[in-house]
Amino acid sequence: MKVSLGNGDMGVSAHLQPCKSGTTRFFTSNTHSSVVLQGFDQLRIEGLLCDVTLVPGDGEEIFPVHRAMMASASDYFKAMFTGGMKEKDLMCIKLHGVNKVGLKKIIDFIYTAKLSLNMDNLQDTLEAASFLQILPVLDFCKVFLISGVSLDNCVEVGRIANTYNLIEVDKYVNNFILKNFPALLNTGEFLKLPFERLAFVLSSNSLKHCSELELFKAACRWLRLEDPRMDYAAKLMKNIRFPLMTPQDLINYVQTVDFMRTDNTCVNLLLEASNYQMMPYMQPVMQSDRTAIRSDSTHLVTLGGVLRQQLVVSKELRMYDERAQEWKSLAPMDAPRYQHGIAVIGNFLYVVGGQSNYDTKGKTAVDTVFRFDPRYNKWMQVASLNEKRTFFHLSALKGHLYAVGGRSAAGELATVECYNPRMNEWSYVAKMSEPHYGHAGTVYGGLMYISGGITHDTFQNELMCFDPDTDKWTQKAPMTTVRGLHCMCTVGDKLYVIGGNHFRGTSDYDDVLSCEYYSPTLDQWTPIAAMLRGQSDVGVAVFENKIYVVGGYSWNNRCMVEIVQKYDPEKDEWHKVFDLPESLGGIRACTLTVFPPEENPGSPSRESPLSAPSDHS
């Protein structure tokens, strides 16, 4: 039982515990520590019982203090007064690493627990706190710096953070500069940045609202401000993404700069940009830091599908904004698609085959292939498949695309095609032993795995593995359940098979809620938690090590669905997380780094420097 007295009790509380010999009472004073601290401070002010005098390194002013008090608040003083240091027995100690202002601030804090900071005394206080290892004061200094960062002082705060190794402050300053760099360009404050911080900013994917040409001009201004800075020209230019500039800007604004024509590194950067722009089809396999999208926004992306009500096929490309918890539109495809294949190489999204019209038999399959470039929010057509195909699987593996099986007006397909971006052409590789459609696939360890599907109107449970180096298929341990129109993905070293459908009895279809994963090293399957609701013919994507299953069709409910279910492999749990804007079957999903639409509205100003040849054959 706890007993507390009123306001006049001097903050006393008591805990009462009955025992055989009577009641034991434990008392606690809530004001004792502050009273003792005030008492020590008064002793210091009056010069009573002080047993050592501290002298700052920059003067002769003396500060009488109590050894025990200083040692209790500082590991530095504890080591000095209790270890084998010569200062242990000295009555007067000169602290050469601390000045008068800093030492007074530290002593006042130790005796009062209070600290006043401004930009005039901050560095003296920081230096003393760092030298004397007063961690609370260091924390207060960090809070003071972070809370006061502005366009006018961010460069100076960054310098202080770097000098005293204040990692949290340094990180905050970097983020502040990245967020406000356009404003710093306008004010000219960026010219005061040290090389290391400017190079970091220019290399960052988090730098927004600046074109590469603007960044190049800013770098040139910084270099020309002081002659010694020109030594950094090549190192600084490595952070400018010249391949993303237009050829006109490269000629008119970049090649006219003297050091870009004379410095070997800079000349090579221009050659790199020229070569990159001359080979638009190869770009996905030519990616580097200088050709990557300048964005740190990676999102779940969905594409196409057939609408539940009108059975109209969609051409929408959407991303899910996790912060706003809403779907946002990117550039739509030129033609609608469902039952298509999608894959990503070098953050370029390929859309292959599928259908533009609703047709459950696959008779309207197409062979066209398009590629989405998120840097410019634009689509371009590339070489078409050798065969029209839908209800097939598409994988990206070792810089190539593999289109596996499917169906068309000619029937079920066993053929497999490989797309080479370097040549912009499709060629046949080893076909499957039997035709398959409605199967699923994923890649792991340089191999492609294909599971289940439908062959001659029969659902399958087999797992096949394709090795692109040997151009051979091998059989692996079969799934425990036959399924088709399911999905498959890789997380870590496990290959997950999820959802789909199969026959109930002899003719009716049934959702498959059971899920399992395959271990390539053990060649065996392990069951996992079942889905909350059936989904077939879905989009699937792995985002932050969670599996997202998007849209599709529920055979038990006989309708397209709008739900998105998330599976957590670590917890073995399913959750319904959000919905699509509408119910869509035959939709596809992936993850892609993009410019969120508010940063790239329609993108008239974000012009692509790349022009593909008009012949798509």
Swiss-Prot record:
Q: Which InterPro entries match?
A: BACK, BTB-kelch_protein, BTB/POZ_dom, Kelch-typ_b-propeller, Kelch_1, SKP1/BTB/POZ_sf
Q: Which GO terms describe its molecular function?
A: cullin family protein binding; ubiquitin-protein transferase activity
Q: Which UniProt keywords apply?
A: Cell cycle, Cell division, Kelch repeat, Mitosis, Repeat, Ubl conjugation pathway
The answer to whether keyword Cell cycle applies is yes
One GO BP annotation is: protein ubiquitination
Question: Kelch repeats span which residues?
Answer: 299-347, 348-399, 400-446, 448-493, 495-545, 546-594
Q: BTB domain: from which residue to which, for each copy?
A: 50-119
Domain of life of the source: Eukaryota
Chain ranges of the BACK domain: 154-255
Quote the PANTHER family the UniProt record gives.
KELCH-LIKE PROTEIN 9 (PTHR45632:SF11), LD33804P (PTHR45632)
Q: What is the official name of this protein in its record?
A: Kelch-like protein 9
Q: Which gene encodes it?
A: Klhl9
